[in-house]
Amino acid sequence: MEEVYKWRYIMDHQKIFATNLFVLDDFLPQITTAEKSIVDGMKKYISDLWVNRKYDENWQTKSADLHKKKEFKYFTESVIGVSKKIINTLDYNVKDIAITDMWANVLKDQEHHPTHTHSNNFLSGTYYLQSDQSASIVFHDPRPAADVIVPRRKNTTLNNSSVLSYASKQNRAVIFPSWLPHWVQQNKSKHKRISIAWNIQVKGQLGEHHEFQSADF
């Protein structure tokens, strides 16, 4: 294929139907003693629930209302703030947003989470409260025809991959469309992997007023 390069082409490389995913390292800047105490408070709250758990495998908090707990107030405000910035970045026009669910996940050695989506929500996210980068989150291209023809790759890039993984780096947040299929790889660490997950729904008019399939949330 090298002979192709002798021609001078003018190309406009347009990436259509984007799947927008956001990775935020150092999501909670632990600079001051106060910020560190916030993180420690969230860890203690989850650890206390973990000690009194009713089951042992792939543990999650029983209720998904951590955003209503005082220990998660600062974290919740951070999630709302960055979610509003994302929606503004994507040029959506909404009245407001709301967290519908927030819960904690604890994965022990050899545990994993199977493929799933987060139905009836617009954005979803996960934050790694405690992790040594084992048990990455993995996203899969949901388009059924995307793997019909897959040429061999010179290099693996965002442009030619149908599966992408992101390490569960401590203090990292990953925010993605709720419809995007994802799973969590097996935890091969001897330490527990603690994450906080949440869902975001938009408020306001969905669709255009002249469309029959519009709605007002």
What function would you assign to each model-found segment?
Residues 3-92, 112, 212-217:
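Non-heme Fe(II)/2-oxoglutarate
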Residues 102, 123, 194:
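Residue-level detector of short, conserved catalytic/binding motifs and their immediate flanks
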Residues 190-200:
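A short alpha/beta connector and helix-capping loop motif
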Residues 113-116, 182-189:
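Short beta-strand His + acidic residue motifs that chelate non-heme Fe in jelly-roll/DSBH
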Residues 105-175, 202-214:
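Catalytic core of non-heme Fe(II) oxygenases with the double-stranded beta-helix
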Residues 70-100, 108-122, 129-135:
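Active-site region of the double-stranded beta-helix
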Residues 36-37, 187, 207-210:
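Short conserved micro-motifs at the rims of enzyme active sites and ligand-binding pockets
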